[in-house]
Amino acid sequence: MIGVRRVLALVLVLLLAGLAACSGGRPIGNLNVPAKDALDAANGVTEVSFWHSMDASNGIALVKLVDDFNAAHVGKIKVLPVYQGVYDDAITKYKASVQSNTTPTMMQIYDIGTQFMIDSEQVVPMDDFAKRDSFDLGVIQKNIAGYYTVQGKQWSMPLNSSVPLLYYNKTAFKAAGLDPDRPPRNLAEIRTAAEKLSKVNGGPVTYGFGAAIYGWLLEQFASTSGELFCNAENGRTGERVTQANINSAKMVETVQWWQKMVDDGLAVNTGRVTKDAQDAFKAGETAMTLESTGQVKGFSSAAEGKFELGAAAYPVVSGTEATGAGPSVGGASLWISGPGHTEAEKEAAWQFTKFLIQPDSQAFWHTQTGYFPVNTKALDEPADKEYLAKNPLFQVAIDSLSRTEVGSTTTGCVAGSMPQIRKATEDGLERALIGKDPAQSLAQVQKNVAVSIANYNDSVG
């Protein structure tokens, strides 16, 4: 069958790219939406195996939602959540489960796994469930829905979404003679502030700036500048991505800026581990950092009694934010498996999905985790209003996303080789921060990525 050959080809190309095997002999089929009465026709309790990557407090919040759903469906549906490790580990296990015919009914996959999941031909699009039920997907925040919509179809349901912000230490700004209510808007302004903040110039903190070597952060500089990170309209309109614009003028300028900041003692190279950059900011060693909205609560708690925390829209490379431009979302979404699963299992997974995104569930999820509420009506819930009153900085994220127009430049690049693209971007930045020429480093990364993209595209025809 064509589907089997495609999946086997995906296995080969992902192995060549250094990823785990994807799939084997599972027949492609059973991808249709079940009948509405599928659960009524089922005998006994229908179980939904649910693989996810939420740990610590986020995992506790997710399990609480699962328990609430199960309590409301005793004798009919039982969701069985299983933590499968971080995103990369989870998708590796998913690929192995396809090969062994043991896929979960529902899978949480990170944003950059979107095109792979579509190409795997293993999932039933959420759009199809919604159309069957006349379910209004318009309740999903437009930019978040936009990320998971490819060729006009929403394939998965966002669960945990976030956008990046510029966080800064207002107390340090005041000590350095800077206006704490006028945060930097672009890279030049960050440098100007860092020059006054950094110890090397007699400033109040060790370093003015510090952020993790994280590809998602670099991708945002294309989005906020109104530029495509990948060609083919970021892979959004049907034509496959054949090139990532890693060595574009904006990317080179960004990496050159970052390198010089480190060389001049205005920024610290904290490496790829995001926690290291977070800890440096919490400890007051750095005065500015780039991070997701998921850190609003953590940064606020760390700053309490130590310094006043500020947050601002994600910076642009130069000038001011282009009209309609803004950040693209990150996080993960939910996918419902088709092959190997009964009609009742698919329907039960859909019912659970709807429960997770209803306003009260999303208000709970938002207030417990700091992730962006994907259902816009969640912001009207009393619990969410109380949370925003206590965490007013989150309004910065809401405003930033609200004014960002949905389009190819702001929904992020969707490509089957996106995990490799992101890692390669990190490789380029990392090499530059230890002394390599930024333009040459990114040019080499561009060549390496082109091979990965071509191999993937060849595998799917």
State each model region's role.
Residues 68, 72-140, 175-177, 182-185, ...:
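Extracytoplasmic "Venus flytrap"/periplasmic binding protein-like
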